[in-house]
UniProtKB/Swiss-Prot annotation:
Species this chain originates from: Pseudotsuga menziesii
Protein name: Unknown protein 13
Upper taxonomic lineage: Eukaryota, Viridiplantae, Streptophyta, Embryophyta, Tracheophyta
Length: 25
């Protein structure tokens, strides 16, 4: 269960980075 949570946090971070980086292009 802990591994799953960590994976989700990483995924959220990636999505956030992608969204924040998108308008700059």
């Amino acid at each position: 269960k802990l591994q799953e949570l960590r994976m989700w946090s990483m995924l959220k971070k990636w999505i956030l980075m992608f969204i924040l980086d998108f308008p700059t292009r």
